[in-house]
Each structure stands twice: as structure tokens, then as C-alpha cells.
Amino acid sequence: MCSVAVTGASGFLGQHIIQHLQLNAPWVTEIRAFDMTSFSKALDYKSRLDVSIYTGDIGDTQALRKAFHNVSAVLHVASVIDVQFQPDRKLLRKVNVEGTANVIAACQTEDVPILIYCSTISAVQGYFNCLGGSETDVEDTWPLLFRDYGGTKKEAEWMVLRADKTPLTNGGTLRTVSLIPPTMYGEGDRLIATILQYASDNNGNFIRMGNGKNLEAYAYVGNVAWGFVCCLKTMFNDPNFGNEKMFIMDDTPPQSIQALSKTYLEDRGFKMTSYYIPLSVLFLICLLLEMVCLLISPFKRISFPLSLSAIVFSMQKFYVRYDKAKTLIEYTPLFSVEESNQRSLPYYRNVKLRK
């Protein structure tokens, strides 16, 4: 019997993890959903189990302890993603670092033997190209491209792995693993939805930024969620497995966000412009904006989505492989690239856009 608590259960990835626990993990006997917003099933599937809903802030240790009491495992997915210029550093640290410390402490106090942490590729991505790299190839990356977001996630990952093999109050041991997904797409995603919104606001035309020849790692969210279930099963069956970190990818080809979005834009009757704004021009504009905002920053914090880091990201070739996950947790993508696309299309076709 395996009882599982999922933090960030109401979010993009959390919803898909709950779905796979319902449909593809018959050995799981209880599911608990912890989030700031009360969990409500957002995906179309038939539930096998009633989900126990726990509403609370990740900074509330008592709420975490209540949610984790007598569970077999915790999947810690809750986090703040902020890669814009001048992100909210206090919030990033409060949720990603201090929140993770609270999760670890609650696991130790409530005798939870399994903790699986959701990291991010931003915790290993720097100012260099990486063509099919492994975990060890990028282990000591510094500086990080998205310093604040990636830095807090990297610090939290380090805390989780350092907690491996710590004693529990019942005499047992806490085992920990960190899973590292890339940027994800699929049902619930807001990144491509934002691109659709930009096109809608511009009479159905998405103005390209750069030539789109960069190569970045993307994965279908359903496959990433399946990776968490594979890891959970491995750790549940082998109490000695832990202190590992690994990429969770699928077979989505490395490509630019423009290429990934093209099908979904066209499906809604939108199109990309034949011309594009050179990244060098965007870089200079962004540099000037950042300099002005930094001068103002002692008096007022100004944030905006475009940043120098985002421009550099759009110039890179950075993708990794998931051989380690194949070997250690017997993970293979549940959905092919074609199936992932077919599952994603209805969502992007119907996602609500502002008029």
C-alpha cells in the first residue's frame, strides 16, 4: 500500500502527476493534493481514487505536516517560476528554497521515507551550448543563464539530495531523488498560450524574434509526469535507492519555441511572419532597458518579460539526454511525439484568449 502526497498538485505538472497516479499506478492506494488553491481535476479522465485535498501555503509547516502524516512518499512539485527581468527574488527564495526546506523538515518529522523533488533544466543551463549532454556534463554549471530562478532551484535540489539517508523519528531513513525536466508543453501550459495571445493581439500574426535556428529541450508534460511515477515505483520497491538526480525528457526533437508553436498557431488560424526581428537588435534594446531599470531600481522595481538572459536563450543550442532515467528508473516516454501533439492540440485550440 502506497500513500502519496503531491505539492503543487493544482499546477501544470501537478495535474498530470495526479492523472498518472490515478490511471497508471494501481499500487498507489491514497492520493493527497497539497496546494495554495484547492485541487480540482482539470484534465479529462476517470478517477480511480478520491483525492484528499489539503489547502495551504508551503511556508506553513503545520499544514505540510498534516498533509504528509502517514504517507509513503512526497512528490514535491510546488515552486515559483520567474525568468523575467528583475524577478521577485524574495518570493523565489521564500517558495523555492525556504519552502523546500519546510517540505524536507515535514518529511523527517512525519517519517516519510521517500521524497522526489522537481528541479528544472534552468538549474544546469549556463552561457554555453550543450548538444545531448548528460547529468555530469552540466553538474557544476556556473553562472546560470537564469540566475535567480535557476539558482533557487539548484540550491533547493542540493538541499534535497543532502537530506538523503537522514534518520527519521521512527528509526527509518529518508531517501531522496531529484528529477530535472526541460520546458514542458501540453494541457495546462501557459508558454505557448502566451504566444497564441501575442498572435491574437496582432491580427493573427506572430512576429518572429530571431531566425528560430536555436535548439532547446522540450518535453510533453504527460511524459514528465510519467517519469515521476516511474521514480516513485522504483523507490517504493527498493528502499536503498536514492541520492540521484536525472533528466526526464522525451523524444520531442530539440527545436526553437517558434518551431514548437507553429502547429498550434496554424491550428487556430494564426501564422508566423516571414520576417523576424534580429536578436542583435533585441539584445541592444533589452540592454538599454535593463540599464535604465537598474538605475531606477533603488526607488522602484520594474519587471518585464524580455531579458538579456531570454535573448541569450534564443541564441543557444542546449539539450540533454535521459539515458540515466532509462537505466535507473526504467523510464521511457508513455506518449510518442505524435501522440503528445494530438493530446496537446485540443487544449491549445480551445484555450481562452483575451479579446
Q: Which ranges hold each PLM region?
A:
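N-terminal Rossmann NAD(P)H-binding glycine-rich loop of SDR-like oxidoreductase domains
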Residues: 2-27
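NAD(P)H-binding glycine-rich loop region in Rossmannoid oxidoreductase-like domains
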Residues: 47-98, 106
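Conserved Rossmann-fold NAD(P)-dependent oxidoreductase catalytic core, especially the SDR/UDP-sugar
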Residues: 98-151, 168, 177
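NAD(P)-dependent short-chain dehydrogenase/reductase
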Residues: 167-232, 261-264
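Glycine-rich Rossmann NAD(P)(H)-binding loop
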Residues: 184-186, 209-214, 243-254, 265-268, ...
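Conserved C-terminal active-site "lid" loop/helix of NAD(P)H-dependent oxidoreductases
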Residues: 221, 228, 245, 290-295, ...
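Mid/C-terminal beta-alpha module of Rossmann-like enzyme folds, strongest
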Residues: 234-304, 322, 343, 353-355
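Amphipathic terminal alpha-helices
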Residues: 320-328, 332-355
